[in-house]
Amino acid sequence: MGRRRPPDRAPVLLNCFREVVGEVSSDRPVFIGGKSMGGRIASMLLNELSSSGAVRAGLCFGYPFHPFGQPSRVRTEHLEQLKAPLLILQGERDPMGCAEEVSRYDLKPPLQLQWIPDGDHSFKPRKRSGRTEEMNCDLAVELADQFMRAVLA
């Protein structure tokens, strides 16, 4: 079994994202996004890629507002400069940005934040919540669909 490696550094990931978007046909609306760090990288490129017309908006599933266990190291500076729509779907109990912590951040449109009930970083709820992971994933899909339809309207 192979050893788990950390992800590439941000400059490598940013360039990879740019390359992939550059290969996508522009005859249809393009949305970028990702889970956790992938969503963060997409959000960091959103202004650049939307101003060039390459993408319409972004989606983040479980945004890492701060490193695990380090709530004072907030990663929101670039979010304050957004010009294109961005939807962040976040579990209420996400250890990298729970509802209580994130409610104190100064997040404004065009950023939209939607909470996944009792969800952790992967949207998994506790059993006692009465929700299931499937319910939360279905909700995330529904919210993402509504967001994309609104952007395209």
Where do the model's predicted regions map?
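Gly/Ala-rich beta-loop-alpha elbow adjacent to hydrolase catalytic centers
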Residues: 34-42
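Short beta-strand/loop motif that positions the catalytic acidic residue
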Residues: 81-83, 88-90, 94
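Conserved alpha/beta-hydrolase "acid-adjacent" motif
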Residues: 95-101
